[in-house]
Curated annotation (Swiss-Prot):
It comes from Macrococcus caseolyticus (strain JCSC5402) (Macrococcoides caseolyticum). Belongs to the ATPase delta chain family. PANTHER family: ATP SYNTHASE DELTA CHAIN. It is a peripheral membrane protein. NCBIfam families: ATP_synt_delta. Pfam families: OSCP. This is ATP synthase subunit delta. The keyword GTP-binding does not apply. SUPFAM superfamilies: N-terminal domain of the delta subunit of the F1F0-ATP synthase. The keyword Magnesium does not apply. It is found in: Cell membrane. GO terms for cellular component: plasma membrane; proton-transporting ATP synthase complex. Keywords: ATP synthesis, Cell membrane, CF(1), Hydrogen ion transport, Ion transport, Membrane, Transport. F-type ATPases have 2 components, F(1) - the catalytic core - and F(0) - the membrane proton channel. F(1) has five subunits: alpha(3), beta(3), gamma(1), delta(1), epsilon(1). F(0) has three main subunits: a(1), b(2) and c(10-14). The alpha and beta chains form an alternating ring which encloses part of the gamma chain. F(1) is attached to F(0) by a central stalk formed by the gamma and epsilon chains, while a peripheral stalk is formed by the delta and b chains.
Length: 177
């Protein structure tokens, strides 16, 4: 099913980009996703087969009247197809297309203590050189199991410079001998 969400997101991104509204559509999708997080009433409504198309459209018009036309059109299609519950994952895929277009990526930096903004900037600069991305959107997560050092995750790639990893590698080398 994820293929469907990605196709919706890609089509939405292409249309929004052509109309020059891809940034505001991304912001709207982020807000929509945050607003729907844990909203059981929305998902019950969205997945209820008894709810008519007219009620779904009325909901979309009343709730999302302030969003750009490409997003309103997608919401209308999702209402017709009874797929409004796909919105959160469509938002995620849209963000992936947006990031790819802007040559940027999310980066999670795990460390034993919270890093300062200067430290995160330095780490970001080093990884920008290493990865070729124009921009890294960095999130710092405290993880005391690392013992020391950092573990950075960009997309599906993990760069592990933690003391815990070094100890694990050392232990493996002892077992080989």
């Amino acid at each position: 099913m994820a293929i469907v969400q990605d196709k919706y997101a890609q089509s939405l991104f292409e249309v929004a980009q052509a109309q020059g509204v891809h940034e505001s559509v991304r912001q709207d999708l982020v807000e929509i996703k945050e607003g729907l997080a844990g909203n059981k009433a929305f998902f019950a409504f969205a997945e209820d087969p008894k709810v008519s198309s007219e009620k779904r459209h009325a909901f979309v018009e009343a709730t999302f009247s302030g969003v750009d036309k490409p997003l309103r059109n997608l919401l209308s299609i999702l209402a017709d197809k009874k797929q409004l519950a796909l919105l959160p994952s469509i938002a995620d895929y849209y963000t992936e297309h947006y990031n790819k277009f802007n040559n940027q990526q999310y980066m999670k930096v795990e460390s034993v203590y919270a890093l300062s903004s200067e430290e995160l900037d330095e780490i970001g600069k080093a990884f920008i050189k290493r990865t070729g991305y124009k921009k890294l959107l960095i999130e710092n997560v405290v993880n005391s199991t690392l013992i020391g050092g950092i573990r950075a995750t960009i997309g599906t790639t993990v760069y592990d410079g933690s003391v815990a990893n070094e100890l694990t590698q050392l232990e493996k080398s002892f077992h080989k001998q």
